[in-house]
């Protein structure tokens, strides 16, 4: 039986590659990301390439805590069980040495790379623990 894999930051790069790898293994994927156009493009592409797997898409900005809760709830209502969570969303801003980083860039990276992913984990974890995942 195919597993259901939720992937944050799935619209490009590593997230897209992870989604493709799970689909190649016969798993179903839930693609999340900020770029709605990319989510729809990937859904169409993956549906054509992997017709036996299911691909769901949900727009998600992990820095928006209300959106995280809403989307998590929507995903759990749509999909019977989440087997795997790949918290891939992240970003890197600026190329300056650390001491020269802009404070806003650091805060944005913390909001995305730490707080956002913690919020996503916290949202899905109870259902995954209940299902022994």
Q: Could you tell me what each predicted segment is?
A:
Residues 89-94:
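Conserved NAD(P)H cofactor-binding loop of Rossmann-fold oxidoreductase domains
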């Amino acid at each position: 039986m195919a597993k259901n894999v939720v992937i944050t930051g799935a619209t490009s790069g590593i997230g897209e590659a992870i989604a493709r790898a799970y689909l190649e293994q016969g798993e179903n994927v839930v693609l999340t990301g900020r770029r709605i156009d990319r989510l729809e493009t990937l859904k169409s592409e993956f549906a054509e390439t992997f017709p036996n797997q299911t691909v769901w898409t949900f727009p998600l900005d992990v820095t928006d805590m209300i959106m995280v809760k809403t989307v998590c709830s929507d995903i759990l209502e749509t999909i019977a069980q989440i087997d795997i969570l790949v918290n891939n969303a992240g970003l890197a801003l600026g190329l300056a040495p650390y001491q020269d980083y802009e404070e806003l860039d650091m805060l944005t990276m913390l909001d995305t790379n730490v707080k956002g992913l913690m919020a996503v984990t916290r949202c899905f974890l109870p259902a995954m623990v209940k299902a022994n995942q």
